């Protein structure tokens, strides 16, 4: 069911992303927007401390983070995570994607993309450039 108050639903799938998750989530909460957005987190039974980090951010930002934390890995059972768990929860007019081991560096990312889509109704999607880095932050080729 759509909700007029939420314009963007951010879909974030997590599996053993503990080393990267805080940076990912900080990229969400630093967003400067003139609209409401939600972050739909799905943890697929991580064996590290990903679930603890998800709960921490959900407690701190309950109006933004909407988690599902699985007890059994769904992907290994052949379950389509987006189709089964993520897309049915979407309330926004627009959907953004960011995996738990990725992160956003631009605090205006969502605002810029929504402005672009709202300005020209012939656009059905937009994306931004990426910078590939290793876990220590060193830029990789590409």
Show which residues each predicted segment covers:
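Nucleotide-sugar donor-binding/catalytic module of glycosyltransferases
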Residues: 1-142
């Amino acid at each position: 069911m759509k909700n007029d108050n939420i314009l963007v639903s951010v879909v974030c799938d997590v599996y053993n992303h503990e080393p990267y998750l805080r940076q990912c989530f900080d990229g969400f909460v630093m967003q400067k927007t003139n609209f409401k957005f939600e972050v739909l987190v799905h943890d697929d039974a991580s064996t590290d401390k990903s679930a603890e980090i998800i709960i921490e951010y959900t407690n701190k930002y309950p109006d933004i983070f909407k988690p599902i934390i699985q007890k059994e890995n769904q992907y290994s059972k052949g379950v389509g995570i987006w189709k089964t768990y993520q897309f049915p929860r979407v309330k926004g007019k627009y959907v953004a994607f960011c995996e738990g081991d990725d992160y956003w560096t631009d605090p205006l990312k969502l605002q810029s993309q929504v402005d672009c889509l709202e300005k020209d109704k012939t656009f059905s999607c937009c994306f931004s450039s990426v910078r590939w880095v290793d876990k220590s932050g060193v830029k990789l080729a590409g």
